[in-house]
């Protein structure tokens, strides 16, 4: 389902902004280092099988977001092989495709189409989506009138009802109140149990151990460990002490 082989990703190294005088005085260094790059990912390789749920952990700057952006297709690898088979549904920035002046009902259709469904398919699911979101009385109001919690509930409801083949999740299990968070977690577990391949990036080790069947630990752009959630999370927490 997901095959990654010797994946490298680089970005231009950040440079300090210099005034004209500093630029002239440091010109020899600038010319010497003009090809400097920052390697966010350094030759990582792994495979994820259909129906597998893999957690990605690591400190900020470890390469998690870069990897997720490549898996999603919004960034390209500098070198290496990225082979992904299946429709990808992101649970990253919920409601990114929502239009504030349109109603919740209209945004269900638009967002559902953006996530790969036909209008007919999403119309069939709309009642179920509205019920799951628990905002039925506001569904025909413009989403700009929604609270942040209502907005996120509706966006999450749309995403989990679009029959994804590959689910890419980044820290979104804090949607709504505590009750809705539990409901959200159960919805994701149901998708996983139904064979949806899932990649879950999180700083919550409890959520990782609860949902994932395997964990990859990234550190400075390389894979530090890959295996059983309890073992890998244990190693990660031990090093952080």
Annotate the PLM regions:
Residues 226-227:
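ABC ATPase "signature
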Residues 57-59:
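The feature captures the beta-strand-to-loop junction immediately N-terminal to the Walker
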Residues 3-39, 230-234, 238-241:
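Pre-NBD coupling/linker segments of ABC/ABC-like ATPases
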Residues 23-28, 109, 121-138:
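Conserved ABC ATPase "signature" region
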Residues 220-221, 236:
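Conserved ABC ATPase "signature" C-loop
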Residues 208-210:
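A short, surface-exposed alpha-helical micro-motif characterized by mixed small hydrophobic
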Residues 202-203:
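H-loop/switch region of ABC-family ATPase nucleotide-binding domains
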């Amino acid at each position: 389902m997901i095959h990654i082989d010797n994946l490298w990703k680089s970005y231009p190294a950040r440079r300090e902004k210099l005034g004209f005088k500093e630029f002239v005085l440091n010109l020899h260094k600038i010319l010497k280092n003009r090809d400097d790059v920052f390697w966010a990912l350094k030759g990582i390789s792994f495979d994820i099988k259909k129906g597998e749920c893999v957690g990605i952990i690591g400190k900020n700057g470890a390469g998690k977001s870069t990897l997720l952006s490549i898996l999603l297709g919004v960034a390209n690898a500098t070198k290496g092989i990225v082979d992904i088979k299946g429709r990808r549904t992101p649970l990253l920035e919920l409601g990114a495709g929502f239009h504030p002046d349109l109603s919740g009902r209209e945004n269900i259709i638009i967002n559902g189409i953006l996530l790969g469904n036909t209008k007919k398919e999403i119309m069939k699911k709309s009642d179920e989506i509205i019920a799951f979101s628990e905002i039925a009385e506001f569904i025909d109001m413009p989403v700009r009138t929604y609270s942040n919690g209502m907005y996120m509930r509706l966006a999450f409801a749309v995403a989990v009802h679009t029959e994804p083949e590959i689910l890419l999740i980044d820290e979104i299990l804090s949607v709504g109140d505590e009750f809705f968070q539990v409901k959200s977690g159960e919805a994701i577990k149901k998708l996983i149990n139904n064979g949806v391949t899932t990649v879950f990036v999180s700083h919550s080790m409890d959520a990782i151990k609860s949902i994932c069947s395997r964990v990859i630990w990234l550190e400075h752009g390389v894979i530090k460990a890959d295996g059983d959630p309890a073992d890998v999370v244990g190693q990660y927490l031990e090093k952080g002490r």
